Amino acid sequence: MESQQLSQHSPISHGSACASVTSKEVHTNQDPLDVSASKTEECEKASTKANSQQTTTPASSAVPENPHHASPQPASVPPPQNGPYPQQCMMTQNQANPSGWSFYGHPSMIPYTPYQMSPMYFPPGPQSQFPQYPSSVGTPLSTPSPESGNTFTDSSSADSDMTSTKKYVRPPPMLTSPNDFPNWVKTYIKFLQNSNLGGIIPTVNGKPVRQITDDELTFLYNTFQIFAPSQFLPTWVKDILSVDYTDIMKILSKSIEKMQSDTQEANDIVTLANLQYNGSTPADAFETKVTNIIDRLNNNGIHINNKVACQLIMRGLSGEYKFLRYTRHRHLNMTVAELFLDIHAIYEEQQGSRNSKPNYRRNLSDEKNDSRSYTNTTKPKVIARNPQKTNNSKSKTARAHNVSTSNNSPSTDNDSISKSTTEPIQLNNKHDLHLGQELTESTVNHTNHSDDELPGHLLLDSGASRTLIRSAHHIHSASSNPDINVVDAQKRNIPINAIGDLQFHFQDNTKTSIKVLHTPNIAYDLLSLNELAAVDITACFTKNVLERSDGTVLAPIVQYGDFYWVSKRYLLPSNISVPTINNVHTSESTRKYPYPFIHRMLAHANAQTIRYSLKNNTITYFNESDVDWSSAIDYQCPDCLIGKSTKHRHIKGSRLKYQNSYEPFQYLHTDIFGPVHNLPNSAPSYFISFTDETTKFRWVYPLHDRREDSILDVFTTILAFIKNQFQASVLVIQMDRGSEYTNRTLHKFLEKNGITPCYTTTADSRAHGVAERLNRTLLDDCRTQLQCSGLPNYLWFSAIEFSTIVRNSLASPKSKKSARQHAGLAGLDISTLLPFGQPVIVNDHNPNSKIHPRGIPGYALHPSRNSYGYIIYLPSLKKTVDTTNYVILQGKESRLDQFNYDALTFDEDLNRLTASYHSFIASNEIQESNDLNIESDHDFQSDIELHPEQPRNVLSKAVSPTDSTPPSTHTEDSKRVSKTNIRAPREVDPNISESNILPSKKRSSTPQISNIESTGSGGMHKLNVPLLAPMSQSNTHESSHASKSKDFRHSDSYSENETNHTNVPISSTGGTNNKTVPQISDQETEKRIIHRSPSIDASPPENNSSHNIVPIKTPTTVSEQNTEESIIADLPLPDLPPESPTEFPDPFKELPPINSRQTNSSLGGIGDSNAYTTINSKKRSLEDNETEIKVSRDTWNTKNMRSLEPPRSKKRIHLIAAVKAVKSIKPIRTTLRYDEAITYNKDIKEKEKYIEAYHKEVNQLLKMKTWDTDEYYDRKEIDPKRVINSMFIFNKKRDGTHKARFVARGDIQHPDTYDSGMQSNTVHHYALMTSLSLALDNNYYITQLDISSAYLYADIKEELYIRPPPHLGMNDKLIRLKKSLYGLKQSGANWYETIKSYLIQQCGMEEVRGWSCVFKNSQVTICLFVDDMVLFSKNLNSNKRIIEKLKMQYDTKIINLGESDEEIQYDILGLEIKYQRGKYMKLGMENSLTEKIPKLNVPLNPKGRKLSAPGQPGLYIDQDELEIDEDEYKEKVHEMQKLIGLASYVGYKFRFDLLYYINTLAQHILFPSRQVLDMTYELIQFMWDTRDKQLIWHKNKPTKPDNKLVAISDASYGNQPYYKSQIGNIFLLNGKVIGGKSTKASLTCTSTTEAEIHAVSEAIPLLNNLSHLVQELNKKPIIKGLLTDSRSTISIIKSTNEEKFRNRFFGTKAMRLRDEVSGNNLYVYYIETKKNIADVMTKPLPIKTFKLLTNKWIH
C-alpha cells in the first residue's frame, strides 16, 4: 500500500488546507512568554477562514458537551419569575431570539444562568430584544433551516449556495476557571466578530468603532452571562460588575489592554526572531519595521546589539537576498545600517531588471512560435554574489500545507541560471498579472477554488511525493487503481479515482510526462517537485523558474500569496472525460488479470518466479503485461502464510539496541543448567548463571534443586550484590519459559522490585543465545579442568566457578576489553591464581597432639569469594576449606601420594578456618600469622613473658616484687592468677583493623592498679601480684605493666577454697610511694568478672577538691592560681548549690561489669563507671557464665539501671557512620521550576511577579554579557560534553520578593570541562562567630552588603556552551558562555578568585592565613560568603570607603549599614541577630523556624505541653531488623533526611546544646524505625517549643587587656555502637560560646581515659587555629585554656615519662598532646564534672542537669 501525505480539503470541512492546519487555540497552560499577538491574529484569521467555509446540518452543529452548560428546557416549562419584567429575562425564540437563532441549534429557549437567579440580576425591559441581522451575512449562533436539506452541496454550485445559506457561528466555550479568562476573552471577541458585532469591540485606545445599540447591549450582556459563570470570573471582573453589572464593554476594553501590554514585548522578540524577507515588499518598509522593533526592545531594557540583530535579519533573508548570509556572516563589526545598504542595493537592482524585461507572450500559440530563450541582459552588480548557492526546494508551500513528506528527493543546486534567466512573477492578487501574462484555464467543471488559489495554475509542493489534480481534462492513459492509499497531513485518507500521466509541453518545445492521481477531494491542484526532479526538472526559487539541470529554462514560476504556482497552459489536454475515468476499469479490452488470481492459478508460486516464467514464455496463452502486478509486492496470501509458516531468522546484531539503551548491569540474561546425576547429596546438581548485556560480566551460583524458594534466594542475592557493589538497579532480566522462571512467586518478586521479565518466545532458543552459549562454554571448561586435574566429578561446580573467574578477566576480541574492565574493576592478579587442581599442603592449625603432623595434603580449586584465601579440597576429609596457610607443590611427583590420610584426625568444625581472628600476642614474643582467615588456637597468655631472662617454671620469679612485699603473699597471688581465664569479647567490631587491637611489646595479661601520687608524678606502676582490679571510676587507676602468668587454659573459674587476698603493696618504678590494695574476699571475688586492662590507665580518684588544678606549665603557685581564675572567671558555668560531704564507696562494692548492648545507640548514654569490655574465652559456653549472668541481672534489677540491660544474644545491624557535619543530608527544595512558577501556575498575581522576575534576570544576564551574543552555534557542530544544560529556578524569599535565577546543570557537567582542583571557598562559621564576638567586645560597626549576580562578574576560562533561554525560541542553537553562570562546578571558585584579587589589589585587604574568605586590613575586617559580605570596623567611615570601592566594580547593595546606636537587627547567613553596640548580641532563628518547621508535617504539641529537654536518659534505639516495604522505606528515609537536615542546620548555627541528639539520630537516617522517627519528632518538637531561644552574648568586661580562648572537652565512654565513644567540645571566646562539636570517636577506646584523650586531641587543633584567627583580627595578647573533667588525661599530658604506651594509636595521640600543649603556651585545667557544660555534647541528661548546664549561655 502506498502511503501519501498531502494537504487536502476534507469532504466534511470545505475550508482550505492552510486554514485547516493553522487554526489553533492557545491553551490555558501555554507559556505566556511564547504567545505573540501576531501568531494569535494569524491563527484567528485562519480559523475564521475555515469557519466561514463550513456548512453543517442541524444535527452536527452542536457544541461539544460541557458540564457547566445548563440543559435547554422544553418550551412547555414555564420560565422562572425574576425581576420586575415577568418572563422577559428568559428570551424564547418568539420573543428575544433573532430569526433562525436558537441556542446550540435547538429551537428552544435559552437556559438561565446563575446571574439571573442572583439578587444582582435585573433583566432588560420588555422591549429589549436581540438585534436582527441581514440574512446575507448570517446571524449569531444561526443554523440552517431544516428545509435546506443536506448542506454538502455539489462543488459546482457551492458559491451560489453560500449566499443562500445562513452562516453558522460557533459559540465560545464555557469559562471553567478564573485563570482561563484571558484566553476565553479572545474566543468571545472572535464570537462577537463572527456575529457581525466587530464594530462594538473596543480598540486599543479603549473606544469602539461605532456606538452600541440597546439590542446589541442586551445580546452582549446575556451571552456574557451564559458563557462566563460568575464563580469563574477573576476578581477584577467581579469588581467591575459590582459597580455596574451591565458594563461588559469596560471588561472587554480592560482585557484588550491587558493582552496588549502582556504580549507586546514577547511579540517583538518573536517577530524579530522570525523575520522573513525576499524582496516582495519595499526594502524601506522592511527596514522601518526592523528598526522600530529594535528601538522598542532597547527602550524596554532588552538590548539587541548589532551582531545579534544582523544575524536575526540575515537568517530571515531568502531568494536573491539569501547570499548575504554567506558573504556577511564572518564580518564581526557589521552594523544594521550597513546590512540594509546591501539589501537596498539588491532591491533596486531587482526593480531595475524587472522594468527592463520584455513581457511574456500572452497566449500559448504565440509562445510556441517564439523561439527566443529569454536571456537576461547583463547589468553591473552592486555587490558580488556567490554563484554557488544552495537551493531549498522546501519553500513556503510546505509550511503552509503542513505536509510531511514520504519521499524525499535529493535537492539540486538551481539558484543560478547560466546565461539565461527568467525574472520572477509576483502577483498581488489573482487579477494582477506582471509582464502582461494572461492566465487561461480550462472550462472543465471541478471543485471550486479556494480563496487563496490562483486559478489556472498548479501549486508547487515540495512536501508531496505524488501529483494530484482535480480535473480529468489533462489526464492521459487513465486507469483505475483502487489500491493506492493517499493521506493528507492530518492522516486522513483521500479517495483516488484514477491514475494516469500528466504531459507537459514547455516553452523550449520539449515534452515530458509524470504520473498523476485524480481526485476531486482536494483544495488545490498539486504538482510534486519530487516527481519533477525524477524527470530532470527542478524549481529555482531564486529566479522563480522551472529549469533542467543544464540550465535550460522551461517555464516561469508565479508567486501568489504565500505559495508558488506554475501555469496549466503547459499541460496537454486529453479527450478523456470524468465518467470515462470513473469507469475505465470496467472496460474488458483494458482489463488485466489480477495477481491474486494468477497466484492461486499457479500453485501459490511467488511473484518473482511467475514473472520470470512469463518473460521466458514457459507459460503460454498470456503475457507478462496481461497481469496487474501493482499489488504483487504487498500481497499476502493467507493460505501461503498458513501452509508455509516457518521460524523467523535470527537477525545478526539484533541485541545492539539493548546495548545502546541500557547502562551496565541493567539488562541481565539468566539460565539454569542441570541436573548432573550420580553425585553425593552435598554436591550441587544445578547451577544458575547470569550475564550482563553491556559488560558481559558473569555470575554463577550453585543449586541443589530447582524449587521456587531456591531460585528466589539466588535472585535476591544477585540483585542486592549489583545494587551495593555497582550502584546499579536491574531493569530487565531475560530468561526462558521454564517453570522455575514463570512461577508466580518469582513473578511477584520481580514485579515488586520493578524489574521487567523478558521471556523468550515459543521455540526460539536462539533468542536466548547469550545465556545458552555461556553455559556451553562453562561446561566445556569444566570437563577440561576435571580431566586435566583428575579430581572427582562432584567438584564440577568448583571448576565452573574457576572458569567464571578467569572468563571475566579475559578480553573479548570484539570489545578489546575484559568484562571486569567494562565493569570498572581491576584486572585479575595472576599471582593470586593457581592452576585448577594444583597440589598443595595446608597447615593444620589445631592438631590433636603436639607430635601429630602439621600439614595435610590438598588440591587448590579457586580463589575464595568471601575472603583473601583460597578454596582447597582436602581428600582425606572430603571437604573444602578456605585458607591462606598452604604451600604449593611444584610437581605431582611428591610425597602427596605417600601420605596416610586415615592417620590424620582433625577438629570436625573446619568452618573455623574461615573465621576472622586477630591475635593478641605481641610481635616480639610470638611470630604473628599472616593468615587473616584462620583463627589461631594458641592461648595468648601461655607464652607471654614480662622478663624473658626469668625461667618459666619458677612461678615465684614471674614478677620482681619490692623488698617490702611478703613472699607468701606473692606466691599465693601468683598461684591464684595462674587459674584465671581472661576472656575475650564475644564479638569484635568488624571495622577494627588488626593494627588497631594488637598489643605493644610488653602488654600485660592481668589487670593493673596504679598509685595516684606516683601517677601524678609521672610514674608507671607494676602490680606485685595479679590481683583483681577494682572497677570504680573514682578510686581506680590502672597501670601499664603487670606480671606474667602461667598457662590458664585448663582453669575456667576460681577455686572456692582459695585464701583471701591480703593488702598488697605496689611498687612504683617512677615514684617513691607505695600503696596497698584492700583485701578481697572469695565471695566478692566470685561476683567479679575479670576485666582486661585498658591500653591507657583509667581515671584516678576524684575525691579531691574541685579547685584541685593540675597546670601544665610550672610557673609560681600565685601565677598558676591567677591564670586559672582568669580563664574560668567569665565562663558561663553553672552555679552549683553547696553539698554535704559524702563518703566514697568501697571500690570493691562497685557495680560489676555488665555486658551492655553495645550494638545499640543510646540517647541515654552509658556512664563512665558502668560500661566495661568483658573479654571472654571463645571456647566458653553460655552455661559456664550462669553466676555472671545471675549477678548481672540481680544488679541490673536492684540498681534500676535503665541505661543497661543484661547480656543477651543480639544480631548486629551495620549502620552508617556518624556524620560530623551532616553534609549528606538532602535539603528541602524550596525553589520552583519554570513550569511550576509560570506555565502551570494558577495564581495570577504570583505568576505575574515571577514573570517580572524572569525578565529582570534575563536583562541582568544580557547586561553582564553572560554569553556571546554575536554568534549562535549549531548543536551538531559542538562537542556534546561541552554543552551544559540550563534551567530557570524561581524562589520566593523571606522578605516576600520573587526571584528568578538562570542556572546551569552542574550536577551533570562533564569532568573534562572544569578543574577539579579548584575550590569554592566560603567563610567558616567559626570565623563568622569569632568576628561577631570581637565586634561586640570592641564596639565595632557591623555593615551587611550584597553583590547582585556575583558569579557573573567572573570570567570563565573553559569553552562551554549552553542552550539559549526559552523566550528566544532557538532550541536548536547554542551560545557560548563568557561568564561563570550559577550552577557550574567552577563558578564558585572563579568568583572567589575574582573577588579575592579585587579586595587585595584594589581595597588594600589581605586574607587571613588558614581562614578562607576572611580579609582584613588595619581598620576593617570582611567575612565573605559567596555574594554576601559582612564588614566590621571601629569607624563607620572605614566601612563606607570599602563600599565605595566595591561599587566602582560591582553592583553592591547595602542591606544594613549598621550606623544606629540602638538595637539593630540583621539576617546574616540564616542567623537572626539583634545587636546593640557596647551592650549585647543575641543570635537566634525564631522567624525561620516558625516558617520552616510547620512545613515538615510533624505533629506539633500532640499532648498540648512543651518539652523541657530534647531527650531522656536511659532510652536505647532498638536495632532489630526492619520489616518494611521498599516504598515506605524510601519515604521514611526521605522524611528523616528533611528533619535531620533542618535540625543539623540549626544545631551547627547556634543550638549547640542539641548537637548530641542530632549526631546520634543522623547515624540512623537509613534505619527509620518507629522508635527513631518518634525520637526525631521529639527533637523537632523541642526545637519548636524553644524556637524563641537565643544564644546570648554580653560585652566582656575584662580585668586584663587579653583575649581568652577556651575549649571545654568531654567524652562518654562506650555509649555508641561497637564500643565507640561519643566526644564533644565547646569553644568560648571571652566567655561567649562561639561553637560546638559532637561526634562519635573514630577509634574504639578501651577506657574512659582513652576517650577523654581522643576528645582533647580533637579540640586542640581547632583551638590553635582559632587562636591564630583571633590574633590576626585583634592584636591583643591571647590566653588559651583547655578544661577537662579527667584528671588522668591531665596527668598523662603533663607527664615527662618517655615509656611507650601499650596502645600505639592513643600513645601517639598522647605524645602529640604533650608537644602541642608545651609548644603553644596552652593551659590545661581540671573542671568539675557538674560544671562541665560540654557534658551536653556527649550524653542525654536529666531535665534539671540539662537546664543547669545550658541556662547561662542559651535562653
UniProtKB/Swiss-Prot annotation:
Residues 1610-1752 form the RNase H Ty1/copia-type domain. It catalyses: DNA(n) + a 2'-deoxyribonucleoside 5'-triphosphate = DNA(n+1) + diphosphate; Endonucleolytic cleavage to 5'-phosphomonoester. It comes from the Eukaryota. Residues 1338-1476 form the Reverse transcriptase Ty1/copia-type domain. Residues 153-165, 402-418, 960-969 have a biased composition (Low complexity). Residues 299-401 are annotated as: RNA-binding. GO terms for cellular component: cytoplasm; nucleus. Mg(2+) 3 binds at D1610, E1652, D1685. InterPro entries: Aspartic_peptidase_AS, DNA/RNA_pol_sf, Integrase_cat-core, Retrotran_Ty1/copia-like, RNaseH-like_sf, RNaseH_sf, RVT_2, TYA. The C-terminal RNA-binding region of CA is sufficient for all its nucleocapsid-like chaperone activities. Capsid protein (CA) is the structural component of the virus-like particle (VLP), forming the shell that encapsulates the retrotransposons dimeric RNA genome. The particles are assembled from trimer-clustered units and there are holes in the capsid shells that allow for the diffusion of macromolecules. CA also has nucleocapsid-like chaperone activity, promoting primer tRNA(i)-Met annealing to the multipartite primer-binding site (PBS), dimerization of Ty1 RNA and initiation of reverse transcription. The aspartyl protease (PR) mediates the proteolytic cleavages of the Gag and Gag-Pol polyproteins after assembly of the VLP. The capsid protein forms a homotrimer, from which the VLPs are assembled. The protease is a homodimer, whose active site consists of two apposed aspartic acid residues. This is Transposon Ty1-DR6 Gag-Pol polyprotein. The lineage of its organism: Eukaryota, Fungi, Dikarya, Ascomycota, Saccharomycotina.
